[in-house]
């Protein structure tokens, strides 16, 4: 789960989300992106001040993250 958090942080440093954002990961990796007890999403929420959710995108490779602001 730390690998997905690092990938998301790297992506978001460039994107700087200003509104609620969906993070996309490959199929079956939603819980790894979310983190145990949602800790990864809480870290991102505190750092950027916006809400994050996680969804799946089968076109992505393992450890690849894509974001989309709502």
Feature names for model-found ranges:
Residues 1-70:
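Auxiliary Fe-S-binding modules of radical SAM enzymes
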């Amino acid at each position: 789960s730390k690998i997905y958090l690092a990938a998301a942080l790297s992506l978001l440093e460039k994107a700087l989300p200003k509104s609620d954002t969906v993070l996309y990961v490959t199929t079956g990796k939603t819980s790894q992106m979310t983190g145990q007890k949602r800790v990864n999403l809480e870290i991102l929420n505190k750092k950027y001040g916006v809400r994050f959710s996680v969804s799946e995108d089968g076109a992505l490779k393992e450890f690849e993250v894509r974001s989309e602001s709502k």
